[in-house]
Structure formats: C-alpha cells, structure tokens
Amino acid sequence: MAELVLKQGETVIATARKPEVLDDLKAKYPPSQLLTVKLDVDNSQDIKDAFAKAKETFGRIDVVFNNAGWAVAGEIEGHPEKEARRMFDTNFWGAANVSKEAVQFFRDENKPSGGLLLNNSALNGVQAQSGLGYYAASKYGMFIFVMTDVAKLTEDPSHSIRRFNSSSCRGVGSSLEY
C-alpha cells in the first residue's frame, strides 16, 4: 500500500515493528516523501511516538491505513491461550489503539479538514475458515468495532473524521515478520 501511494507522488509515513525491513523502500524515495518509523501496535507509547514524529516531520496526517495483524493456523483445542491472546492484542487492541490515536489527531491537529481512517480487517473476519478461529474472532472484533459506535464519529463534525471504514481483504504475503 505504501509503495502504491508513493508512486502517485504522495507523502507516506511507513511504520513497522522493525523499520529496517523498510530499507529497500527508503532507498527508492527521498526523505521529503517517505518517513519510516518504528511502530509496534502492541506498545501504546510507540503509537503516540509515531503520530508525534509524523506531526513533527510533515505537520499533518491526512490518511491512516491501519493494517497490523498476524495469524497462526491450528485447531482451537490445540492453540495455546497465550498465543491467541497475543494475536488479539495485535489484531484487535493494537488496531483499536491506532484508531483512537488517529481520531484524536484528526480532531486536534487537522482542524477543520480532519482525516480518513481505513482499518484493514480480513476476509476471515467475516467469512471464517477452519483452523483460523482465533484469528477470525480477532479480525471480526475489529470489523464490528469499526461498524458500531466508532463509525458514528463520521456523523459528528466535531470529530473531523471524513470517513472511517473497514475493508475485509484476502490474506497477502509479506516479508514483515512478527
């Protein structure tokens, strides 16, 4: 997604738990167009720091594409609870906390134009398949989070949210590892 936006000539703040995985992208685009920032969505301070660094560097954020997530396949009875909880921490709570920070940023920093918040859930969140029960539950939780009370933010102009949505895409391969 970041490279697609960069190819259109737009400015991007690309985040990853291990920013060095973005070095190839960083080599292709100038610092005036691309900022890479360490962001582990399981760490609330990382979230705050990433938004602060974006403001310091570019002054505003117009779009947040919330895409963190990971999955481990396996039968429910064989899945270690600790691993399932860690997956929920990232897939639901991490995405929810980034959403919360984005809403606050759009309201406080981008007056009056606000911003666009897109949360990438997963097709498995609405059309689950065997072996991905915990993953599907975490992604469905994010989908419902967006579609319920949080979606009402777009109805209240004081929140400065132009759009808040959730996409449910198929899985994609990634070189970014958990």
Walk through the language-model features, giving the residues of each.
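SDR active-site lid
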Residues: 155-178
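Substrate-binding pocket helix/loop in short-chain dehydrogenase/reductase
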Residues: 75-76, 80-86
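The beta1-alpha1 cofactor-binding region of Rossmann-like NAD(H)/NADP(H)-dependent oxidoreductases
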Residues: 39-49, 81
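Active-site helix of classical SDR
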Residues: 99, 138
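Canonical Rossmann dinucleotide-binding motif of NAD(H)/NADP(H)-dependent dehydrogenases/reductases
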Residues: 1-13
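A glycine-rich helix->loop->beta "capping" turn
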Residues: 53-66, 72
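Residue(s) in the substrate-gating loop at a strand-loop-helix junction
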Residues: 122
